[in-house]
């Protein structure tokens, strides 16, 4: 039974950060504190620019305390760290790219776990949906951005609870070869979307308050979701899950539109990305009113697919290729935006090829390249250009140091 509790807490930790190990700082037999995280910096060339940028560096503190009757209290705090300063290139995850503070919040939750009754946590944490799709998220430079995790133009998924969800109440447990997670996101908050690439929310809010027709106010209510993982054997895992919420879109014209945010899908994984030999993972999803295009316009419905094939050789060189597509087709914008031509097309599609050299499990030098095949065809060529800007081809060389 002790092994089950350890596996339960470990499963939660893996979902929190699949590439992060930890170092024990303190253990008195009752209380335990570990520190984890990594520093990643890279030189990237994309969008006609070359810069040194941060690679989603982070630091975390993991706390646990043994209680009576086989209960364990636990907590985690994680901050993003920006060791290189601000960047003008928005090439991947918008949440990470726009950060110019040295420290910023990524995760923070507290909870309780039992070897039989499972684990309950409260706070900002990886959503249940991430259990379904995280196994394709191993490129160090370019996320897939097709799995419905980093929603609202590549943000951190906090709004609808599919990424690092805000205000989540989550339950996890294991039964035999099955593990499952269920969650509720208790919140009511407003945010703003604008038909402009790379605009801050405060600037977008100002446009809304001034009555601009390129700005909308979104009222997002509570969400809920669940996921299940079936370990067929030591190599093969199957996943499935969903997430659902409700939102209201307010327009400066006075119009109010109520819609459901819904995503569901499944995934398959073979092997272990960090082990020698072959690794493969793929997932597919169908979503409605779940994400926005690269100009912040809510997408009516789309299909997303992510896949990754990797091989680690005996000489500790690891190669991989990833293919990702997020296809909304034409006439995909539900909002009556002034620039929403029904013939506009949205298809995010690209491949990533990478070579990693592992000095050891925690020290990696890498090169990754992205080739874009997206289709953002529009009669408005300036809009088409803006839509494709952050999807450009690119190449990056970096160093990844895990604590």
Predicted regions and their residues:
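Transmembrane beta-strands of outer-membrane beta-barrel proteins
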Residues: 33-41, 69, 73-77, 120, ...
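Outer membrane beta-barrel
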Residues: 24-39, 45-188, 229-232
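Hydrophobic, lipid-facing positions within transmembrane beta-strands of outer-membrane proteins
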Residues: 55-59, 106-110, 165-169, 222-226, ...
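Detector for outer-membrane/organellar transmembrane beta-barrel domains
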Residues: 226-353, 357
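Gram-negative bacterial Sec-dependent N-terminal signal peptides
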Residues: 1-23
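Outer-membrane beta-barrel "beta-signal"
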Residues: 175, 357-359, 389-403
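Transmembrane beta-strands of outer-membrane beta-barrel pores
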Residues: 41-45, 79-83, 126-128, 175-177, ...
């Amino acid at each position: 039974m002790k092994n089950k509790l350890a596996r339960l807490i470990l499963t939660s930790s893996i979902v929190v950060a699949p590439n992060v190990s930890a170092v024990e700082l303190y253990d008195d037999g009752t209380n335990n504190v570990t520190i984890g995280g990594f520093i990643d910096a890279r030189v990237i060339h994309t969008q006609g620019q070359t810069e040194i940028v941060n690679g989603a560096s982070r630091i975390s503190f993991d706390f646990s305390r043994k209680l009576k009757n086989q209960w364990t209290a636990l907590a985690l705090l994680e901050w993003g760290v920006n060791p290189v300063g601000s960047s003008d290139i928005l090439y991947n995850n918008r949440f990470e790219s726009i950060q110019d503070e040295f420290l910023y919040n990524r995760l923070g939750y507290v909870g309780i776990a039992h070897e039989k009754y499972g684990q309950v946590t409260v706070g900002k944490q990886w959503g249940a949906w991430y259990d379904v799709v995280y196994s394709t998220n191993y490129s160090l430079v370019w996320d897939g951005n097709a799995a419905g995790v980093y929603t609202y133009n590549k943000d951190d998924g906090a709004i609808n609870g599919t990424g690092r969800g805000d205000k989540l109440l989550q339950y996890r447990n294991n039964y035999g070869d099955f593990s499952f997670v269920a969650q509720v996101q208790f919140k009511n908050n407003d945010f703003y979307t604008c038909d402009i690439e790379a605009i801050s929310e405060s600037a977008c809010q100002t446009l809304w308050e001034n009555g601009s027709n390129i700005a909308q106010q979104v009222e997002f209510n509570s969400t809920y979701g669940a996921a299940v993982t079936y370990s067929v054997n030591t190599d093969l895992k199957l996943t499935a899950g969903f997430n659902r919420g409700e939102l209201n879109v307010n327009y400066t014209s006075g119009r109010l539109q109520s819609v459901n945010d819904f995503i569901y899908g499944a995934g398959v994984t073979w092997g272990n990305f960090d082990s020698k030999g072959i690794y493969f993972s793929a997932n597919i999803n169908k979503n409605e009113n779940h994400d926005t295009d690269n100009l912040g316009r809510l997408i009516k419905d789309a299909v997303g697919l992510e896949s990754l094939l990797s091989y680690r050789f005996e000489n500790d060189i690891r190669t991989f290729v990833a293919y990702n597509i997020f296809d909304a087709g034409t006439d995909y914008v539900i909002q009556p935006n002034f620039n929403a031509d029904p013939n506009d097309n949205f298809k995010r599609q690209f491949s990533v090829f990478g070579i990693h050299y592992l000095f050891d499990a925690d020290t990696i030098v890498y090169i990754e390249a992205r080739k874009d095949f997206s289709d953002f065809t529009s009669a408005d060529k300036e809009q088409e250009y803006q839509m494709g800007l952050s999807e450009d081809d690119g190449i990056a060389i970096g160093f990844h140091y895990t604590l």
